[in-house]
């Protein structure tokens, strides 16, 4: 006689990479998914960007490059969802770098004494 073992449900409610449901299925688990409309997709990408940036912020050593690659992947998807090419986004970044500078000088602003 076989005993019934109920599945444990774990909620994620987040955007995942395209192959994640397949990978979950290969473990014998069942992923319940849906395809987002454009507005929900953009919102989910913005949430994913925050998630990946937080993971990158907490990463150390050899983990950091992989986390930065995740941030890059989300940025590319977000640019595409906004109707921009990666080249257009890089051009915007270059323009801003020209106007405001980069982060190469390692300048950390502690405070400003404002003239009244």
What is the predicted role of each segment?
Residues 2-116:
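Flexible "arm" and connector segments at domain edges
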């Amino acid at each position: 006689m076989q005993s019934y073992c109920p599945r444990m449900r774990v909620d994620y409610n987040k955007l995942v990479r395209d192959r994640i449901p397949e990978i979950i299925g290969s473990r014998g688990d069942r992923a319940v998914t849906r395809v987002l409309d454009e507005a929900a997709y953009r919102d989910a990408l913005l949430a994913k960007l925050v998630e990946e940036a937080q993971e990158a912020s907490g990463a150390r050593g050899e983990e950091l490059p992989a986390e930065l690659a995740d941030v890059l992947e989300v940025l590319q998807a977000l640019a595409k969802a906004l109707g921009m090419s990666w080249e257009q986004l890089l051009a915007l970044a270059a323009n801003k770098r020209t106007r405001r500078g980069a982060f190469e000088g390692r300048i950390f602003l502690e405070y400003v004494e404002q003239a009244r």
